[in-house]
Amino acid sequence: MNRLTILVLFIFFLNQCSFSEKSRLWKDKEKESAVNYNIKEIFSEEKKITTELNQELKLDLSKIISSNEILKNKNNYGSQDYSGLINKIGNYKFSKFDNINQLNYKPLFLDDGLIFFDNKGSIIRYDSNQKVLWKTNHYSKSEKKLKPKLNLIISGENLLIADNIAKYYSVNINTGKLNWLKSNSYPFNSEIKTNKKYFFAVDYKNTLRCYNVNDGSECWSLQTEKSFMIPNSKYSLIIIEDMVIFSNSIGDITAVDIESGLINWQLPTQRSNILQERYNFKNSKLVSDGKAIFFSNNEQEFYSVDVKTGTINWINEISSNLTPIIIGNLVFTVSDDGYLHVLEKNTGNIIRITDLFINYKIKKRKKIKPIGIAIGGTKLYLTNTDGKMIIVDLSHGNVINVEKVAGNFTSKPFIFNQNLFVIRNGSIVQYN
């Protein structure tokens, strides 16, 4: 009887402790398995290999209308008026930046010149002959040593500035005289957008701030989820009707009512636990045609999102942090590995892929990354980290020329008044 009792108890023990999924032994195993799974998901992602598609497809771009009009509040540059001779005709000089690894700042282009800044945060206005009209600096001696980087925008007769040392201010565009100056709690890390009475910028705390154009007083602020990682790219903003829409460091896209500062909708695009490990996450700028928002990132995601609701229209697998360009029913972008993608705007279908790095040897192309694109007429201009600019015939997709424009780092190309500009460290070069 005792033997039978012991046997029954032994079997019962095994059932409850060894084979039951609810037992501690099983839980520990399951927990260990889950940990291993998470590690694999974060660190062992598969990299998509890009190949060319429909190389023989010719695009009908005969109805493209090029212009100098830029829908600045939508970041929608389209095809601009530029003949593409690539003859150097001007050089706007400034003191070089220290320890720079990217030139992701934009000059302000005027009909009679341009405005930019130098290594100490001095704002410089040039005329069309590269002559300095005025130069002004509104930083203390200690602040100049921090090498402030400025984001600039024009509002009427005034220039609005937000920088990476937490200052924002306004100067007269004709004289450089200071109108007002204020400080924020955190440095800014975004472009600036403005409407008639407000301007907007996002700081490193992922907080969108709305300021009064006339005196710099804060109208409202909206903080989104913070990240422990320092972002590798600037945040982006667009304004559509009564909404300001922006991205932050963790990939959230948020639409906010301009007057109240209340959220209309928010779209998370990344899982936060993955982002904590992927410190090099980069989003492209947001671009809109008024109905949809287009953007991509370096995690093989290209999005189209409905402006009104924030719902996803489509997602395609393209890894790129370059600002896409919309022309008619087509969207153009270049992937991190140098492939030009042409997509249908409404469906997201890729209709052609062309290798723009085809003339580089395999070892060389692994070290090169695209910086930015511009489209002039039916030609695409792509700058790269090796200081070269690749010129592409968009109709056929073939490379027609390669120009050396800098020793190494350069900016994306900018087109204005039938001229092309690129920023090198120490100068802005103008081509006709």
Show where each model-derived region lies.
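Short loop/turn segments that connect beta-strands within beta-propeller blades
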Residues: 127-131, 172-176, 212-216, 258-261, ...
